[in-house]
Amino acid sequence: MLWHEKGGSGKRAFLLLHGLSATSGVWSGLESLIDQEGLGRWVAVDLPGHGRSTARAEYSVGALAADLASLVREEPDLFVIGHSLGAYIGLALASHWFGIVVRGVLAIGPKVTWSTAEIQSAHQLATRPVRWYTSAEEVSKHYRRVSGLDEQIAPEEKWLCHSVTHCAEGWRLAQDPRTFEVVGAPFSTLVASAQPPAVFARGEHDKLVSESELQLYSHQVHQIAGAGHNVHVEKPAEILSLVQTFNLGD
């Protein structure tokens, strides 16, 4: 089951794709702004193996893109806004290999350079057993740390509860550890395959990707002042401004 939420109105749709370890809740600020500006509809998804969506037998950018394509196949006017892993998936969808037409992609903060050691470390994480916690507070604190949201999200934020789950063994992250299998996908191939040229954005203080790295792939790179890796959470209004630069066809 691919959990998703929809809002807004109109023909145009924005598919909102979060990053590794996050959930669709990170888009709440941008969703509100899309509604306020009347830009169209939005579809926010918990990626497979995250939040309220079920796990897969295996994980790859292509497999995740195929899952999402089935969700938005009937959308006639589709734009994708993806953060980190979501940016990778957005580029894959924009290839038109999955039977859908994407009119524009905003790729936010994708980590484009992976060392062999980093890839090996991520793949080792994919094989680790689930870690259990004794309380909701403990596991929620851990989630905020591993997702990089510790300073951007208040502990009482409502959507945080969907990032963790409880069963007989105790509390755990809702994320399937095997989702780390996606690390190491060929970014340059995805960029080259995208039919509409992607627009890239990063926070000024993002430690995972530099402006110069993104400029190797596009001349449309926007740096957002005062923000880190989770710029879509920290400064959703800046992201909305970039969305409004697309040829929306109004």
Predicted features, each with a name:
Residues M1-G7:
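A short loop-to-beta-strand scaffold at the N-terminal edge of the catalytic core in hydrolase folds
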Residues G7-T54, N247:
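Conserved HGGG/HGGXW glycine-rich cap/lid loop of the alpha/beta-hydrolase fold
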Residues E31, G38-I81, S241:
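Active-site loop/oxyanion-hole signature of alpha/beta-hydrolase fold enzymes
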Residues G82-G86, G90:
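Gly/Ala-rich beta-loop-alpha elbow adjacent to hydrolase catalytic centers
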Residues A92-H96, I100-T134:
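Flexible "cap/lid" loop of the alpha/beta hydrolase fold
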Residues T134-F187:
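Conserved alpha/beta-hydrolase catalytic His-Asp/Glu region
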Residues H166-Y217, Q223:
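Conserved serine/cysteine hydrolase catalytic core
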Residues A227-L240:
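Catalytic histidine-centered segment of alpha/beta-hydrolase-like enzymes
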